[in-house]
Amino acid sequence: VQTALTRDQFRSGVFARDGHKCVVCGSAAAPLDAHHIIERRLWPDGGYHLDNGATLCEQHHLEAEATTLHCDRIRQLCGIKAILLPPHMEPGQPVDKWGNPILPSGMRLRGELFDDPSAQRIMAPVLALFTDRVKYPRTFHLPWSPGRTKDDCVMHDLSAFQGQEIVVTAKMDGENTTLYPDYMHARSIDYEAHESRSWIRALHARVGPDIPTGWRLCGENCFAKHSIKYEHLADYFQVFSIWNGSNRCLSWADTCEWTELLGLRTVPVLYRGPWNEAAVRACQRDQLGGDACEGYVVRLAAEFHYRAFRQVVAKFVRPGHVQTDKHWMHGPVERNGLAPRPTDPGTG
């Protein structure tokens, strides 16, 4: 892990490594720019890392900002072997300068800075490459979460919760699934048919036409057993967030209202009220409704933008929780059980 430099150290280090000339055309004529390969606003420390910098002339700096000059090409020209990414981004996922994920087809997903006005202006030449699909963000662990691995990220700064109303919901052991009006996918944007997804596909056929254009529903598909065998689920699909056409997560109150309108259910609520660390910690439990409990998720009750996700959503995972995605995808599907259904479904 590289230590962040000061701005001056970054500039002088990048220029010295690159011989004080543009790594693309070899021009030494001023002005030269110490270009951030990945936008510095995406980094918690400002992104002033030597392996996140490149010396570019004015023309190639503009091309890099517009992303017509690709990050991988810049790294190659600089002799950078390791791909350095902000900690909240998934290793191995190619992204452009602005953090937008790049698919194998060359199409791009909308990242957290996609709708930033400055990014929109400079990316004008490539906007036709973007789909309306959005990958669900990586959720950081709370500092006291014991179920994290060495590759997981931890939210050390909890200041965004201070003085705010929060909602703590049960973390369900299923498959993170996103529903659009005309499409659905799990964490991977490419939909892959699987026996465990037949039920959610039928549900999507019913509710998809009622999802507003540009919106998406995110929830847990608990149809198939993963690590926990459920016997008392309120429903197989449980909503935990709804996003509007401006890539804003609806407030929890609006999420519950929309969930009820669509005839769905939210994940169970464990606590709702002002931020109180003791109250949040008290949400840890071994059982919930007769089933084992994987952990819990904390979020602001108010609406927030996609780019704020890593500051306002965090999780606690029980100790020793085993992820079995590869196993359950390749083995026989074991269907979870439902609790007796009330006549009029509520949304928790």
Identify the residue ranges that each predicted region occupies.
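Short glycine/proline-enriched coil/turn segments at helix->beta-strand junctions
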Residues: 19, 28-31, 181-183, 213
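Short coil/loop residues immediately preceding or within conserved phosphate-binding loops
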Residues: 9, 29, 163
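Short, conserved, surface-exposed binding loops centered on an aromatic residue
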Residues: 13-16, 23-26, 47, 228-232, ...
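Histidine-centered nuclease catalytic patch
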Residues: 23-55, 64-75
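A detector for short metal-coordination/catalytic motifs
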Residues: 49-52, 58-130
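Short, charged surface segments at domain edges that flank catalytic/cofactor-binding sites
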Residues: 1-21, 42-51
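Residues at alpha-helix termini
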Residues: 16-17, 59, 261
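Core nucleotide-handling region used for phosphoryl-transfer chemistry
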Residues: 130-348
